[in-house]
From Swiss-Prot:
Designated name of the protein: Probable transcriptional regulatory protein LVIS_1199
Family: Belongs to the TACO1 family.
Positions of the UniProt region annotated as Disordered: 1-23
Keyword annotations from UniProtKB, A to Z: Cytoplasm, DNA-binding, Transcription, Transcription regulation
Family matches, as Pfam families: TACO1_YebC_N, Transcrip_reg
Listed GO CC annotations: cytosol
Amino acid sequence: MSGHSKWHNIQGRKNAQDAKRGKIFQKISRDLYQAAKAGGPDPDGNPQLRLEMDKARAANMPKENIKRALDKASGVGGAKFEEITYEGYGPAGTAIMVAALTDNKNRTAAAIRSAFTHHGGSLGAAGSVSYMFDRKGYIVILREDLDTDEDTMLMDALDAGADDMETTDDAFKIYTDPSSVTAVRDALQEKGYSLDTAEARMFPQNTTEVPEAKASQYQGLIDELEDNDDVSDIYEAAVLPEGVE
C-alpha cells in the first residue's frame, strides 16, 4: 500500500512538473510566433526572435516545437492566426485583460466567456477595463552572474532611452515607452547585457486585493485561462491576499 502511495506521489509531482513545463513551452511558442510575425522568421535579421530562441534553448524546448512556431508565423499549413484582446471582470469586480492568439475567434471567445462565467466573473465589451491599464515597454535583466550594481544599471538604462527602473533581488526591471522598447533593447544588448524579457505589455494603474472568500474562485479563473492554448497573456489589476496562492 505504501509503495502504491509513494508511486502515486511521485507520479503526481511528475504530472505537475510536466504541466508547468508545458505552460512554459506554450508561452515561449507564442513569443516565438509573435517575434517572427513582427520581424520575420530569420533570427539573423530579427533581434527579438534571437532573444526568444535563446530563451527556448535555455528552457530545453524541443527543436520541433520551435520549428512549429516559426512555421505558423510563416503561414505554413495554411492556418491564419490573429491577436485578439478580451476584457472582463473577475470575482469581486477585479479587472482582467486576456490577450489571445487564435485561428478561430468563435472558439476562443466562447471558451474565455465560459471561464469568466464559471468562476463568478463576466466578459465585458471592448474598452470596459482597458482604461485601467497602461501599455509600457518592459525589459528584464536577471542579476544572477551579472557584475553590475544598481546605479550603473540605472545609468545605462536611462542612456539607452528607458523611463524608469525597478530593482528586485533577482532582476532589474526596466520600463520604457512602448514604441521605444526595441531601441532600448538594442542599445542595452550593444552594451553587453543579456536580456531575459523585452516586450510591450499592459500594467494596471492600480490594484485591488481579492477578498479572501473569493481568492480560490479568482485563482480558478486565472488557472483556467492559463490552461487555454489560445491565451498568450493575462493582465490583472488584482492581488491575492497575503498567504494565498
